[in-house]
Amino acid sequence: MMQMRFATKGILFTALALICIPARPVAAQAQQDQSKVTYTIPEYNAFQAARAETNAQNRLKLLDDFVTKFPSSTLMTYVDQLYISTYTELKNYPKVIEYADKMLAMGDKLDTATRLQTLQTRVQVFPFAFNAKAPDAHDQLTKERDAAKEGADLLAKFPKPADSKLTDEQFAEQKKPGIAFFDAAAGFADLQLKDYPAAIEAFKGATANNPKDAISYYRLGLSYLGATPPQSVDGFWALARSINLGVPDADKIKDYLRKAILVYEQPQCDNLADQQVTELITLAGTSGDRPATYNIPSAADLQKVAGASTILTVFSDLAGGGDKAKLTWLALCGAQFPSVAGKIIEVKPGNGFVNFEVFAGASDDEIQKATTANMDVKVWTTAPPAGAAGTTPAAAQPDVARLAKDDGILFSGTIASYDPSPFLLHWDQVKVDPSVIPEKADAGKHKKAPAKQ
């Protein structure tokens, strides 16, 4: 798998309010509990003083004083909630997680709404607090995954309040962003743990409930590519979907997608990946799931096509257009053919080269009757300039200038490009077989096209 580093503090979860299940404010809960009066007036006043303090550092001192003076207070749950909000304000995220875990350890003593709110806060700040190099990094990720999965499960099962004016369908719809949030968090932890099947499942859940979540699609793509064996095409689709939705660092992800496709296909013409990526991003904008009919050929697929191709099948496959032409071109762009025979239809001298317009066909009779070229064969008559096509341009052949219209030609070369209509296959890095080049004395005496060797 090609690795792309992604920062745990770079792409973060968007803040989310679980508006469908509002938890009671800390003050309201404490005031409601006054009817039970299980705490003293000094405890209550100390708590209210801490709650009313607007300076976070001063509030923290008041909370610490409260815990020192009243370590067994029945208000401790509300104190812990204030600790969580205060440490969040101070951006001390490890402490937020510490107090969230303390509250979650209370189990059934927490009402469901408060538990969900605490899970949400814990999950939301985790990417800020997580240190991948910490000795307990694996344990941190496991706890984060478990908290996120619990949050998704609790929210999915949370019943509609009796006084809600929403229909069941509306209430279920309102919960979807929250469930997606928790699923995305679980997927993030699974991805870091390299549990790719679990990450795929989590991110698919997240994107099903929030189809516009570009970050989850990005991470789903990484999960597919990290699986064993890699689910490459699904991974490419998910990455393209994330780019279409405007994921942060889209240009970098697009470059990564291009490189990943090149590694997967190993084509000889790297520039073809640019067109593929553009097309893929456009298509992925129409659907979160890859259509069963869409595919990207692997290197093995392209090698199979190339191995079964002849110059005649290249003509028919490329001229036919459609998916067959795309596949054939991916397989054969830049391919070298050792022996191609045809008849020269026209000679076009250039600056240091000659372009032979050539026809190749299935039979000698077809070749001799041809009047229209289906190949453009470029042969250098002087040393090719720096930057000429091909990594190892063919040596100059000045003697090819003696070849004329209607002469037969036999050459080896590399397919460079093609025009679909009228069809014309362009060749470069060409070497004409010396045996078909007439001697000076024989120039103008036409020879029929030689048989392919």
Where are these regions (language model features)?
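N-terminal leader/linker segments that initiate helical-solenoid repeat arrays
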Residues: 25-82
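TPR/TPR-like (Sel1-like) alpha-helical repeat modules
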Residues: 103-105, 139-156, 225-251, 258-262, ...
